[in-house]
Amino acid sequence: VAKIPVLGGETNTSTIMTYGYNPKIGKWSPFHGALYAVVESVCKVVAIGGKYDSIRLTLQEYFEKLGDNPTKWGKPFAALLGAYYAQNRLGIPAIGGKDSMSGTFKDIDVPPTLVSFAVDTVDADYVVSPEFKKTNSQVVMLSTDRLENDVVDFEMLKKNLDKVTELIHNKQVLSTYALGFGGIGEAISKMAFGNRIGFKFNEGIEDLFKPNYGNIVLELASEDLSLLDGYNYIVLGSTTEEQSIIIENEEISLEELYNAHCETLEPIFPTKSVDIKEKIETINFISQGEAKKSSITIAKPRVFIPTFPGTNCEYDLQRAFE
């Protein structure tokens, strides 16, 4: 999420850009992989504060070398059908994209890949971030059913997305999270990390790690569940002061969870700076000689800011020097 840069003023108009793709689903069924890529990216936009019916998509496809193998050609065809089906049911178009059919190295092929990127605009006042905001909040999950062939019920999904937008605009939710690859478990953990606010699950919560795309977790601003009358939802639990996640008789500290979450890629993409133990020499820039007076008494500096297509920050640079 970012505000749109403007010259000589301020704006509340912001842009949202999200993505969706699950390689395991794409490998199992390119049709479902693409369909749920669109669903995931759209739900993420709505969870942030956007509206599903004003979203525009751009799709990135990546497949193995197809050659003259009809089975291989069926993979991108099925993926495009899945993406088109989701777009048609949601009433939103893809206005761009890029494809590559060279995802083969020797005997290794990429999984059938269609990544959906969703773009929308939103007033910054309506933007909601995913981290829990306070303790003793009720946390619910707004759920969308699956129909035959494991395709999401798009009519229910659109109804749920409209409800989330309404709740956000009425300031009735404090935080939101659109379910992704890791399901409820991932959502609650990441929502707890931000402000180190714990969570206690209610009894009987199942399918913690099922990627139920289309479901959205909401931290409610009040305990009034009548806001969700007529909708399919479950109460997951409540936020706590203890910095841990409790489910049944198990309690896991947020510190332990966060370290487990980060350690996989820490050697490749370090997030912690290395302490410098060597003594750093103090360098003195004070001149010992006589100060020289410039022949120019009035300085009028000029700043040259080169800009190129596809780059940004020129407005920020200009503002910094003004």
Question: What do these predicted regions represent?
Answer:
Residues 17-18, 58-64, 302-307:
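Short glycine-rich or small-residue beta-strand-to-loop segments that form or flank ligand, phosphate
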Residues 66, 319-322:
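Disordered, low-complexity tails and leader-like regions
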Residues 31-99, 103:
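A glycine-rich phosphate/pyrophosphate-binding beta-strand-loop-alpha-helix module
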Residues 217-221:
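Short hydrophobic/aromatic beta-strand micro-patches
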Residues 312-314:
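Short N-terminal binding/cap micro-motifs at the start of the first secondary-structure element
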Residues 1-11, 18-26, 71, 76-77, ...:
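Intein/HINT protein-splicing elements and their conserved insertion hotspots or analogous self-processing inserts
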